[in-house]
Design a protein with these regions (language model features):
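Zinc-dependent metallohydrolase catalytic domains
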Residues: 1-160
Length: 168
């Protein structure tokens, strides 16, 4: 997911400075010399990659699944709303978070910041991309309460010990 986050944030940051046909291209400035794509790019944010079909165990390839979800959210919600959700939901993630955990954290973040106004759009994107279960099925796990996520994250956090100094 980390590569996908990085690609999304770079694409979102530079989107307003690029012509429309290049907005979903990451690294187009570098890829000119070796990419045969038109337009040239290292990776694209508007791919049709889905989970688990396109998961290959390579961080950049797999990151394209995540960045495509985030870019689709940006297209649906607008850059300002999507960027706030993407950045804020990081506080709910742990080093072991998976795609589904992060999608649920986005839903929870929207519930906290926007009273859930965008939950249906968020859920639809992640269901369509194969990351969240289809809500019409028996398993309806999309969206956890903030307290539940915080408690789970606290359980996973390593315990810290503080050495106490002895006073004289």
């Amino acid at each position: 997911m980390g590569e996908g986050f990085g690609d999304y944030l770079a694409g979102s940051f530079f989107a307003s400075a690029k012509p429309a046909r290049l907005q979903a291209c990451v690294g187009s400035w570098d890829a000119v010399s070796y990419s045969g794509d038109d337009p040239p790019s290292l990776r694209r944010l508007d791919s049709n990659k889905k989970y688990p079909r396109d998961l290959h165990g390579e961080v950049h390839d797999d990151g394209e699944i995540w960045s495509a979800c985030l870019w689709e959210l940006r297209t649906a919600l607008g850059g300002s709303v999507a960027d706030k959700l993407v950045i804020a939901h990081h506080f709910l993630l742990t080093p072991s978070s998976k795609f589904e955990d992060a999608a649920n954290a986005l839903i929870t973040t929207d519930q906290q910041l926007n009273d859930g106004r965008n939950v249906d759009v968020i859920r639809d994107v992640f269901v369509r991309r194969g990351i969240l279960p289809n809500p019409k099925r028996k398993n309806r796990r999309a969206g956890f309460r903030f307290d539940d996520i915080r408690a789970e994250a606290a359980k996973r956090r390593p315990k810290r010990t503080v050495a106490r100094s002895r006073g004289r």
